């Protein structure tokens, strides 16, 4: 995907950081989309050094359809959140379906480093575990999951916990 020509809001102004392989070590398509990883906030590498590996692990475990994961900063996520959701504040994760193709595979997940770190600290969680949870959360949104109603929220939380368990990570909904 060429972010400069992308109609999607998150990658439209960002330069690519690299293109991971779309096959596994045996040359077989893995059954999930290996997302392009764009790092627009270099501090991600300091706080979560192997975020790229984690993104690929989560993509595999969650059956990701995301074309792109953007590791961004609070300022840029705040702008996106204001423009697309009318909320003038940063949020932890935003997801964008493919433009003009509701229900189609693909889409983007954008994360704000400052929010992710503050939330992890407040919840006494390791930042890598919180990032994994937010990636799973974003993938589930791209799969059509929602949490606007209590029943939907419970189902989404249960699926998040199941995927996190498959990754060998703690249930994000249990207090430690």
From Swiss-Prot:
Its cofactor is Zn(2+). Keywords: Cytoplasm, Endonuclease, Hydrolase, Metal-binding, Nuclease, Ribosome biogenesis, rRNA processing, Zinc. Binds 1 zinc ion. One of its GO terms (cellular component) is cytoplasm. InterPro entries: MetalPrtase_cat_dom_sf_prd, YbeY. The keyword Transferase does not apply. Zn(2+) binds at residues 137, 141, 147. GO terms for biological process: rRNA processing. Its main location: cytoplasm. The keyword Cytoplasm applies. It is found in: Cytoplasm. Residues 1-21 have a biased composition (Low complexity). Single strand-specific metallo-endoribonuclease involved in late-stage 70S ribosome quality control and in maturation of the 3' terminus of the 16S rRNA. This is Endoribonuclease YbeY. It comes from Granulibacter bethesdensis (strain ATCC BAA-1260 / CGDNIH1).
